Amino acid sequence: MDDLTLRYFDAEMRYLREAGKAFAQAHPDRAAMLDLDKAGTPDPCVERLFEGFAFSMGRLRQKIDDDLPELTESLVSMLWPHYLRTIPSLSVVALTPRLSVMKMAETVPAGLEVTSRPVGPGNTVCRYRTTRAIPLNPLAVEKVVMTTEPDGRSVLKIGFACSELADWSQVDLHRLSLYLAAEAPVGSTLHLMMTKRLAALYLRLPGNDERIRIDGWFSPGGFAEEDRLWPKGDSAFSGYQLLLEYFTFREKFMFVHLNGLENVSLPAGISGFDLEVVLSQPWPADLPVTDDVLCLHCVPVINLFTLEADPLIINGLESEYLLRPKRLQDGYTEIYSVDAVTGSGRTGSAEYVPFTSFRHRGGMLRHDAPERYYHTRVKRGVTGMYDTWLILGGQRWEADRMPERETLSLRITGTNGQLPRRALQSTLLDRCEQVLQTPVSVRNLCKPTLPVYPPTEDRFHWRVMSHLGTGFLNMLSSAEVLRGTLALYNWRDDELNHRRLDAILAVQHHRIQRFEKGFLLRGLDVEVTLDGNGFAGEGDIHLFGEMLNRFLALYADMNQFNQLTLIVQPEGKCIRWKENHSPRLPG
């Protein structure tokens, strides 16, 4: 994490040493007491003076350069709160039930806690939770092999092991989720082949030489509302979170859903079966396919957990109060959000409501609502970590703030900060709550990511408001504007993301009008030209296009449809998506 305070401090110290020596040479009589023109160990008193001055001036320069966040943070926090929140550490875990004892499917609810082994100098246990519910079926992927049909087409053979005790009438195989746990080139190519290059789907039962044709298909995962990685604010737009998730954690989109298997009647007592996925084009010979590239029962996890903050004693003389996580002063725990604030005093207790919910008195013309509210601000601390400050307000709070001291109890959502990645060599997510009848083991399939913090430089908040104040067509006015819009969501300093954005060469849009079933339909045909060399293969291009297509569908006007076309250079290949008709308001 970039420590701005340390950067400004070092800059001021360099200036004092370099400029001080030059000043001492030019004016030896005035600078003699600074002891700067002598070789050897510097005077500790002078060093202490320089360090104190450098810290003060560094903070002053940092304040001058921060583009007045007081003017922008309040508006951004109310309308687009996701721009001010940290994206915690993320990973994907596989839940493995004990197959031999499973008789029916069970569902693991969202929010299942998954913990790591003790890591770091304080042996801290990092706590994650699942982002969505996941069904556990009496199935397991046993083998994955890429073979060839007699006509030369490639075939992906997936061998499933089954519980012999399973009652298949109690198992719903609709939308069977598979995670592509492979390196990026293999994973993106598999994603493309299974979702866009499927020629036929067959089921082969043991002891049966004839294979059964299945009317099925694979659909891309990670784009549904229930697939969100973190909670969405009431006023936030779904499309913006989609962009953040794509540029921050692309592993979320490495899921595919098998549709159609629910229409097959599996015999009782079956020990396994093979699924043969016939592809419409040859599989690249330089991309290896191994048994562990496909996994069942996988789900993303996020480093969030509920805890209490240290009680606050409100004296009425301060406008902001620094929050500290209770009992977790380990140097890593950070506050993600404040969920509940309750005050207690001599006259009783009172509940505070979030200011952004407009549920306080006067908000949205409510005159019988609670008269106390709270608001939070996130500031960069001198340690480089982000501190959360609590701001209180309301008519009753203003009236009672001076005569009575009040103690606040706070329930917050916290995160372990950078600890999971800093202790990466020993970080394994291999423990979870046992909430089901069937014993379940867990392991992480990818390394926990570093948390990502909102940008604070390059006038970020002003660029956000400029972007969000424009319309849909303005975003598509040129390649530069579209690149700038997408760059607002590229919070990671990742070279591959920069290459994908730089690969946008041109953007054009044309209005479409046509009559269909007696109605006049209006739409927009969006054409984006890409440089194929900026992506890691054809699968990477298709995934980028799928993300852009979903975003445009959410962003478009409710009374218009849109259609995306990608032109990939230098081949000139055309990739066209279906029309997106929005029956409701975006979000």
Placement of each model-derived feature along the sequence:
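Short linear motifs embedded in intrinsically disordered, proline/glycine-rich low-complexity segments
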Residues: 1, 7-11, 15, 27, ...
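Extended assembly-interface regions of large multimeric machines
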Residues: 1-207, 215, 219-220
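Mixed-charge (acidic/basic) macromolecular-recognition segments
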Residues: 1-30, 34, 217, 226-266, ...
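C-terminal domain/tail detector
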Residues: 29, 345-587
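Short, Φ-rich (hydrophobic/aromatic) sequence segments
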Residues: 45, 49, 53, 75, ...
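Extracellular ectodomain segments of secreted/surface proteins
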Residues: 57-64, 82, 143-153, 159-173, ...
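Residues at beta-strand starts and edge strands
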Residues: 89-91, 152-156, 172-174, 197, ...
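Short, low-complexity Pro/Thr/Gly
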Residues: 163-369
